[in-house]
């Protein structure tokens, strides 16, 4: 029987998923089950540390770390393939970036739904936002709507799991503003695609993050090798 106080949160170690966890708590999900995956990404050790820290911050009911090495074997992403370079930031581009991991969210959500069903959770939270789906096809609202249909068709009759993407129509700036309001510990989050410490400051992930903090007038608490001004 589904328990509407329990939710799985896909915890990447980044600021979006951390904010999603705190948002879930404000919506009455008092028992959070955090799922973190390592798939050979360049900064997987740092991301794991941050996801583990988030589990402590929210007093998670459980923290599950899963190795998904098949995404490294598949390759075709600069996050997992050493033959591909992580490109410098181009926040105005509408092209699919080299950091796109083919159909990653379908893989991660499938595991999250299994985890949710096994623990009678009423929801799965993912921190995708509007600036993600401009470049990543599996972050689009239509994808999440379709995946909700997969959940409904493929789980037990007495299972009722909602796929919640609370920020799918929000910008990164909106998320940063909400997170500051909720007291999200952004010092314990990581976004950089290139480096474990300090963050590079020049990849897409760093650029969107820095721009968000600059737009709300807050200093990003993590260290950067470079800290360019992205907000005009």
UniProtKB/Swiss-Prot annotation:
InterPro entries: QueC, Rossmann-like_a/b/a_fold. GO terms for molecular function: ATP binding; ligase activity, forming carbon-nitrogen bonds; zinc ion binding. Binds 1 zinc ion per subunit. Keywords: ATP-binding, Ligase, Metal-binding, Nucleotide-binding, Zinc. It catalyses: 7-carboxy-7-deazaguanine + NH4(+) + ATP = 7-cyano-7-deazaguanine + ADP + phosphate + H2O + H(+). It holds the Pfam family QueC. Its EC number is 6.3.4.20. The keyword Lipid metabolism does not apply. ATP binds at residues 11-21. Pathway: Purine metabolism; 7-cyano-7-deazaguanine biosynthesis. Belongs to the QueC family. This is 7-cyano-7-deazaguanine synthase. It comes from Haloarcula marismortui (strain ATCC 43049 / DSM 3752 / JCM 8966 / VKM B-1809). The lineage of its organism: Archaea, Methanobacteriati, Methanobacteriota, Stenosarchaea group, Halobacteria.
């Amino acid at each position: 029987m589904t328990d509407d106080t329990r939710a799985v949160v896909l915890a990447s170690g980044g600021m979006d998923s951390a904010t999603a966890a705190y948002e879930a708590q404000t919506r009455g999900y008092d028992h959070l089950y955090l799922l973190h995956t390592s798939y050979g990404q360049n900064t997987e050790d740092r991301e794991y540390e941050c996801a583990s820290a988030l589990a402590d911050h929210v007093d998670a009911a459980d923290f599950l770390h899963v190795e998904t090495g098949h995404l490294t074997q598949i390759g075709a992403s600069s996050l997992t393939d050493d033959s591909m370079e992580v490109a410098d930031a181009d926040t105005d581009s509408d092209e699919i970036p080299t950091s796109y991991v083919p159909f990653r969210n379908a893989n991660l959500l499938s595991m999250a739904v299994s985890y949710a069903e096994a623990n009678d959770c009423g929801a799965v939270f993912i921190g995708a936002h509007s600036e993600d789906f401009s470049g990543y096809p599996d972050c689009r609202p239509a994808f999440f709507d379709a995946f909700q249909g997969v959940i409904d068709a493929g789980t037990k009759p007495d299972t009722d799991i909602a796929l919640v993407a609370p920020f799918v129509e929000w910008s990164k700036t909106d998320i940063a503003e909400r997170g500051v309001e909720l007291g999200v510990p952004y010092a314990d989050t990581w976004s950089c695609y290139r480096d474990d410490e300090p963050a590079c400051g020049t990849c897409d992930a760093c650029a969107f993050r820095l721009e968000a903090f600059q737009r709300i007038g807050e200093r990003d608490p993590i260290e950067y090798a470079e800290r360019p001004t992205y907000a005009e």
